[in-house]
Amino acid sequence: AYACSFPPSEIPGSKECLAEALQKHQGFKKKSYALICAYLNYKEDAENYERAAEDFDSAVKCTGCKEGVDLHEGNPELIEEGFEKFLASLKIDRKALGSLCTLFQKLYAIPHN
């Protein structure tokens, strides 16, 4: 079981819920950025993406946000669609993905492939 490292949102029914969690909680930000990096390397390492998606799903449960994001893990045809919904829910610009991944790797000292 996943242990939540941050409290649930005070606005669980809002469309802004996940975006707010991204701003307020390091634990959620870490899982979100890990998912971005895993997505950018999806073709080389699909397993890593699946793991990151599962971790992110657990972190979403911790937020209490009703909106949620279906990442379609295990369904390669729908990965792109799920990731687009993730970006929209978290209000992340697609153009920023590379920089966010680099930032994540620096913040958490993750070796770059």
From Swiss-Prot:
There is a cross-link at residues 2-31 (Lysine tyrosylquinone (Tyr-Lys)). It is found in: Secreted. The modification 2',4',5'-topaquinone is found at residues 2, 108. Disulfide bonds join 4-62, 17-65, 37-101. Its cofactor is Zn(2+). The modification Cysteine sulfenic acid (-SOH) is found at residue 65. It comes from the Eukaryota. One of its GO terms (cellular component) is extracellular region. There is a cross-link at residues 17-65 (S-cysteinyl 3-(oxidosulfanyl)alanine (Cys-Cys)). GO terms for molecular function: metal ion binding. Its main location: secreted. Zn(2+) binds at residues 108, 112. Foam nest. Gene3D superfamilies: 1.20.120.1410. There is a cross-link at residue 108 (5'-tyrosyl-5'-aminotyrosine (Tyr-Tyr) (interchain with Y-108)). Transmembrane segments: none annotated. The modification Aminomalonic acid (Ser) is found at residue 9. Binds 1 zinc ion per dimer. There is a cross-link at residues 30-108 (Lysine tyrosylquinone (Lys-Tyr)). Keywords: Disulfide bond, LTQ, Metal-binding, Oxidation, Secreted, TPQ, Zinc. After isolation, the blue protein turns green on exposure to air and sunlight. Homodimer. The two chains, designated A and B, differ in their modifications, but not, it is thought, in their sequence. This is Ranasmurfin.
